[in-house]
């Protein structure tokens, strides 16, 4: 973000507005709602401003601008139609280290007035950083229709009970869970329907019941207490990287989490959607360097749940497609930890859709197979002969690292060297790249263009459709007969080395014990 959103306390603080017309009126109206003591400085001040600021706490000064009036001002607003004067006001305020806003001149603003949704004490500010104020206002209009007015009353009610809740519920986690139940339950519905007295009574009853349960729990033995405080684990598929491809359920659980254990293939954009104050722990793995071994991850999930925490295990793609989600829930079951599994869009689906390569097509492919492309050193390529079916699409996960061995093994097994194959890098992301060729040419093409990980391979006749069906980031940057590169060139900025290393985190996990190819066939 280019500007940081802050909420400024201006109650009983001096604010200087230079200008007395309609623009000054709009700013004065907003600032007066925040309780500011407003001084308007202008040789002529509109009747509307005079009426708005009739309270004695405000001051109207009918004079030309003079920087001496800046003294003790918390913020300054330049709202004149004189460009030279506005620059002077900005210069004087800057010299005095006072934040200044020159209306409709973003480069002279230390702060920006956002579009505001006011449900006092709940306030939402929306800003385009001065780039598109009309768009910000349109977003505000949408939010106004989505957020009931009752949220303000609900927040005030919570403020009145805050002290009692803190006294009766000793733990931070317990208080947060209590308030979430209040805001998502009967109390909020009563408030939104206008039954304020009933809402107050319901909140008091909920608090009394919770306090009684805490007292009863403290009187039991440790085993009962541990059972009562058991949390829950959510195994969540984060999808391929584009946050718009998350499911609603994934987003909801991510925003409820107390702690998030995430893999290397979870994009920063998706991770940012988790609850802000949740603990975020990286447990990704890369070849021969695991941040946390799988058994350690299993133990972390169990222990966090036993602490009463809501745990999100966030995995790139889908948890049950080469993601070890099954191993993790086996561990959870053995410890009687409740869990949920939220599917995600797996990389194969995203890469195919965003590259314009249908995985099945009546004229080209009647089935699709998902296979891990990583081979252990020296492992026999016994499975390659199973990939000779030309009316089948094969998707190799994590195949880029072993691309030369993979393509040569397929050719040696009898697959035509002219078989179309594509590399899709950073599928669904703005820096997505697609490189197409054949089994015979793709290794040399990859050496030339250096598409980065994370990437997967799609092999089969359907790859030939990419030429006509590509739609996303559809910039053709290289063409040589049937070889295509879309979405970038060799000079395209690559992720930083740490991120590239993290992208390999799943490779070691996906190699089978016998060194063969692990696979999933969908007919």
Swiss-Prot record:
Pfam families linked to this entry = CysG_dimeriser, NAD_binding_7, Sirohm_synth_M, TP_methylase
Active site residues according to the UniProt entry: 263 (proton acceptor), 285 (proton donor)
KW Cytoplasm (keyword) present: no
Q: Where is this region: Precorrin-2 dehydrogenase /sirohydrochlorin ferrochelatase?
A: 1-203
Tell me the InterPro entries matching this sequence: 4pyrrol_Mease, 4pyrrol_Methylase_sf, 4pyrrole_Mease_sub1, 4pyrrole_Mease_sub2, CobA/CysG_C, NAD(P)-bd_dom_sf, Siro_Cobalamin_biosynth, Sirohaem_synt_dimer_dom_sf
Enzyme Commission identifier(s): 2.1.1.107, 1.3.1.76, 4.99.1.4
**Record's Gene3D superfamilies?**
Cobalt-precorrin-4 Transmethylase, Domain 1 (3.40.1010.10), Methyltransferase, Cobalt-precorrin-4 Transmethylase, Domain 2 (3.30.950.10), NAD(P)-binding Rossmann-like Domain (3.40.50.720), Sirohaem synthase, dimerisation domain (1.10.8.210), Siroheme synthase, domain 2 (3.30.160.110)
Region listing for Uroporphyrinogen-III C-methyltransferase, in residue ranges: 231-523
Q: Phosphoserine-modified residues are where?
A: 128
**Record-level Gene Ontology MF annotations:** NAD binding; precorrin-2 dehydrogenase activity; sirohydrochlorin ferrochelatase activity; uroporphyrin-III C-methyltransferase activity
Residues annotated as binding S-adenosyl-L-methionine:
240, 316-318, 321, 346-347, 398, 427
Where, by residue number, does NAD(+) bind? Answer: 22-23, 43-44
Q: Which UniProt keywords apply?
A: Cobalamin biosynthesis, Lyase, Methyltransferase, Multifunctional enzyme, NAD, Oxidoreductase, Phosphoprotein, Porphyrin biosynthesis, S-adenosyl-L-methionine, Transferase
Q: Which reactions does this protein catalyse?
A: uroporphyrinogen III + 2 S-adenosyl-L-methionine = precorrin-2 + 2 S-adenosyl-L-homocysteine + H(+); precorrin-2 + NAD(+) = sirohydrochlorin + NADH + 2 H(+); siroheme + 2 H(+) = sirohydrochlorin + Fe(2+)
GO terms in the biological process aspect are: cobalamin biosynthetic process; methylation; siroheme biosynthetic process
Top-rank taxon, per record: Bacteria
The pathway this protein participates in, as annotated, is: Cofactor biosynthesis; adenosylcobalamin biosynthesis; precorrin-2 from uroporphyrinogen III: step 1/1; Cofactor biosynthesis; adenosylcobalamin biosynthesis; sirohydrochlorin from precorrin-2: step 1/1; Porphyrin-containing compound metabolism; siroheme biosynthesis; precorrin-2 from uroporphyrinogen III: step 1/1; Porphyrin-containing compound metabolism; siroheme biosynthesis; siroheme from sirohydrochlorin: step 1/1
- Extract the PROSITE patterns matched here: SUMT_2
Could you tell me what this protein does?
Then it catalyzes the NAD-dependent ring dehydrogenation of precorrin-2 to yield sirohydrochlorin. Finally, it catalyzes the ferrochelation of sirohydrochlorin to yield siroheme.
Tell me which family the UniProt entry assigns to this protein. In the N-terminal section; belongs to the precorrin-2 dehydrogenase / sirohydrochlorin ferrochelatase family. In the C-terminal section; belongs to the precorrin methyltransferase family.
Q: What is the official name of this protein in its record?
A: Siroheme synthase
Instruction: Say which species the protein is native to.
Output: Psychrobacter cryohalolentis (strain ATCC BAA-1226 / DSM 17306 / VKM B-2378 / K5)
Lineage, broadest ranks: Bacteria, Pseudomonadati, Pseudomonadota, Gammaproteobacteria, Moraxellales
């Amino acid at each position: 973000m280019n500007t940081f959103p802050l909420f400024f306390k201006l109650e009983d603080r001096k604010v200087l507005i230079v200008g007395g017309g309609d623009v000054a009126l709009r700013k004065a109206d907003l600032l007066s709602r925040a309780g500011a003591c407003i001084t308007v400085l202008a040789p002529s001040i509109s009747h509307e401003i005079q009426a708005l600021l009739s309270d004695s706490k405000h001051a109207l000064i009918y004079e030309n601008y003079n920087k001496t009036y800046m003294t003790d001002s918390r913020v300054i607003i330049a709202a004149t139609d004189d460009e030279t004067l506005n620059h002077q006001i900005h210069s004087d305020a800057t010299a005095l280290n006072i934040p200044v806003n020159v209306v409709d001149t973003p480069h002279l603003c230390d702060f920006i007035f956002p579009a505001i949704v006011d449900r006092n004490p709940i306030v939402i500010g929306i800003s385009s950083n001065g780039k598109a104020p009309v768009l910000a206002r349109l977003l505000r209009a949408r939010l106004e229709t989505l957020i009931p007015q009752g949220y303000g009353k609900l927040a005030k009610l919570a403020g009145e009970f805050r002290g009692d809740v803190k006294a009766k519920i000793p733990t931070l986690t317990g208080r947060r869970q209590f308030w979430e139940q209040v805001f998502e339950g009967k109390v909020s519905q009563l408030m939104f329907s206008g039954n304020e007295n009933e809402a107050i009574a319901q909140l008091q009853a909920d608090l009394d019941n919770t306090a009684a349960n805490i007292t009863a729990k403290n009187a039991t033995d440790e085993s009962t207490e541990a059972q009562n405080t058991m949390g829950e684990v959510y195994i969540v598929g984060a999808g391929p990287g584009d946050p718009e491809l998350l499911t609603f359920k994934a987003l909801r659980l991510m925003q409820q989490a107390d702690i998030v254990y995430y893999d290397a293939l979870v994009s920063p954009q998706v991770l940012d959607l988790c609850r802000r104050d949740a603990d975020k722990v990286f447990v990704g793995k890369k070849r021969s360097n695991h941040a946390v071994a799988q058994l350690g991850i299993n133990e972390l999930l169990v222990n966090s749940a036993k602490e009463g925490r809501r745990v999100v295990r966030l995995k790139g793609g889908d948890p049950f497609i080469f993601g070890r989600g099954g191993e993790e829930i086996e561990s959870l079951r053995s410890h009687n930890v409740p869990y949920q599994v939220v599917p995600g869009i797996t990389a194969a689906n995203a890469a195919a859709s965003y590259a314009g390569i249908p995985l099945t097509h009546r004229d080209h492919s009647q089935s699709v197979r998902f296979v891990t492309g990583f081979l252990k050193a020296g492992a026999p390529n016994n499975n390659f002969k199973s990939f000779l079916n030309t009316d089948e699409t094969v998707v190799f996960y994590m195949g880029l690292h072993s691309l030369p061995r993979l393509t040569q093994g397929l050719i040696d097994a009898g697959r035509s060297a002219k078989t179309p194959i594509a590399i899709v890098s950073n599928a669904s992301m703005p820096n997505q790249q697609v490189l197409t060729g054949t089994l015979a040419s793709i290794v040399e093409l990859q050496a030339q263009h250096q598409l980065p990980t994370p990437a997967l391979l799609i092999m089969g006749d359907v790859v030939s459709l990419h030429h006509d069906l590509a739609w996303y980031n559809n910039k053709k940057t290289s063409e040589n007969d049937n070889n295509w590169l879309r979405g970038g060139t060799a000079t395209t900025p690559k992720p930083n080395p740490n991120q590239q290393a993290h992208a390999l985190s799943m490779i070691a996990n996906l190699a089978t014990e016998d060194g063969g190819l692990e696979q999933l066939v969908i007919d």
